[in-house]
Amino acid sequence: MSNIPTELKYASSHEWIRKEEDGSYTVGITEHAQELLGDMVFVELPEVGDTVTAGEDCAVAESVKAASDIYAPISGEVIAVNEALEDSPELVNSSAYGEGWFFRVMPSDESEVDALLDAEGYQAVIDEE
């Protein structure tokens, strides 16, 4: 069973967000998603300054099994990307909720966070797959 931290919020498309002290949100993919994808070989991230829209694809995770679009859980401006993933995409596998984060976004509509799932809701999504 996948680890689903209770302090995070989740999208049904298997992304997570964590609120940071500056009001931004860190975005990554869940442990469940990286388990399904397998060993990461390449991650394509948005650019700092890009505007992302909730529910739209904004990054790509490529593994030995497949390439998968990564969707923005909330809308806003990308303020940072995890450049470590360029040389070490395997961080997504080894630390999905830590060093394997994808990007940070400053939300344009924080109410979108309320539409995301809590850990229990995300577990229900996994159980239905």
UniProtKB/Swiss-Prot annotation:
Belongs to the GcvH family. The glycine cleavage system is composed of four proteins: P, T, L and H. The modification N6-lipoyllysine is found at K65. GO terms for cellular component: cytosol; glycine cleavage complex. The lineage of its organism: Bacteria, Pseudomonadati, Pseudomonadota, Gammaproteobacteria, Alteromonadales. Binds 1 lipoyl cofactor covalently. The keyword Membrane does not apply. The glycine cleavage system catalyzes the degradation of glycine. The H protein shuttles the methylamine group of glycine from the P protein to the T protein. This is Glycine cleavage system H protein. Residues 24-106 form the Lipoyl-binding domain. It comes from Shewanella baltica (strain OS155 / ATCC BAA-1091). Keywords: Lipoyl. It comes from the Bacteria. GO terms for biological process: glycine decarboxylation via glycine cleavage system. Its cofactor is (R)-lipoate. Gene3D superfamilies: 2.40.50.100. Coiled coil: none annotated.
